[in-house]
Amino acid sequence: MTTDSANTARPSDDRAFFGHPRGLSTLFFTEMWERFSYYGMRAILMLYMTTAVATGGLGWSAADAAPIYALYAASVYFLPLIGGWIADRFIGAKRATFVGGVIIMLGHFTLAFPMMPTFYAGLILVAVGTGFLKSNISAMVGDLYEKEDERRDAGFSIFYMGINIGGFLAPLICGYLAQNSQFRAWIEGMGFDPNTSWHFGFACAGVGMGLGLVQYVIGRRNIENVGNVPQAESKSVVDESAKPDAPTQDSGYIVKMVVIIIAAVAIIGFAAVSQGFSYALSYVLMPTVVIAALIGVFITGTQDKLTRDDWKRLAVLMILFLFSTIFWMGFEQAATSFNLFADKLTDNRIFGWEFPASWLQSVNSLLIVIFAPIVGAVWMYLGKKQPSDAVKFSLGLLFAGIGFLVVAYAASLTVGGKVSPLWLVLVYFFHTIGELCLSPVGLASMTKLAPARMISLMLGVWFLSISLGNYVAGMIAGEFVADAAVLTRIFLIVAGVLVGAAVLLFVISPLVKRLYTTPQEMVPVEPA
């Protein structure tokens, strides 16, 4: 078979990668390396900011570092909304993914230079690059399959496995380079300042993204028919004279795109270099973004003339949005409060050998690989008796709350000295089970309940909940101090919020189910 014929074959005929389209291999490894770069930097970022200057860090307090981390983490999940919009209208998902990867790589390499201007610039570049790559590479995975292709769900499972492989390996490697005393001694022997070990960790993240870009370029012929530039079209007729790669020409959209990019970068940059502004933004950003999202959903729904049932389903999605934000507020303490807890209050030794605190960031990804098939099998076994989406959400919140009760107890034990890392492993176990109950269900609900014309918008709302959760998580980390009583109180408060939210959602779950179930749908059916 010639290359041309291979590229024009129906997607259902392409089974070159473990029974899936060969393009999945290209996207699998690209995402694996991109997540390697993200989780590698994430594992050491908060630690770098709060480590003493004498040992290579910035020497900031948790209160000073938290707003910077919060703004960065929120941007990583907010900017994909803009990146997806740009790709849909101008450059296509394929080009957006490549551009995003290049910007991410440059961001990590910029962080590798031990200067304050490069620190801020690197964070901005990584956030902007992620905005271009994150949503678009997932969209291309979906485009590899025809609508009714039964391999689609399995394909996404393989794709997400790549995410977790990258998430598992990155903290181990980048964390070793950043924190290991033997590596510090080795680079000192090579003539480097041992305090630059943190920047070797950042550079390693950049190398990971670089490897992802190399194999993305090599494998581009495998994704020739997905993620291309949108073609110019009228309401009913496509201009056949338009070139396949010609982007839509709309000066209004271009102006809006430029304004949005400049505004986003300006806000992130100014907030980054002004910690006072970051604090102020924390009290303005969340209400503003939530209100804007609600207004956007309402305006879109009004323009699309939604039915009464559509509005009910949108109400359900906004309820799930609220509880999703609360969940991620707790879950994303992993990179902030829990990371600081691991660094300052945990005895990170195995048989006398001390391992970097950042290594504990690998636990979640490892547990997902182990337990995702088990949780999926439980839902399959229950069949039509499995709990509703709202109840699964409440279970996710409950498990996250239990995790915080565990870490609160562990914090109370630190009055007598450092505690075993197994406490954090147990916390991550509960949080992982909670994530598996909530995250897949939330994403599926957005596509299942949203009106057809609003699916992209509601997927954006889902990522917005993760963005806001990250922001709140970062701000809570600003309260971290190595004091048993203070930490116990903070963790108990978060546990109370999570468990309270779980109970509330469980109580109203019958009402939520009735909102998105029409009389015809009340007949029991096998779950999709």
Language model features with spans:
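Short amphipathic helix-loop junctions that connect adjacent transmembrane helices
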Residues: 43-66, 179, 334-358
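Central cavity-lining transmembrane alpha-helices of secondary-active solute carriers
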Residues: 66-87, 134, 168-170, 362-375, ...
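Hydrophobic core of transmembrane alpha-helices in multi-pass small-molecule transporters
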Residues: 32, 107, 118-133, 321, ...
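C-terminal ends and interior cores of transmembrane alpha-helices
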Residues: 99-120, 395-416
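Glycine-rich segments within core transmembrane alpha-helices of 12-TM secondary carriers
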Residues: 76, 153-183, 201-211, 361-368, ...
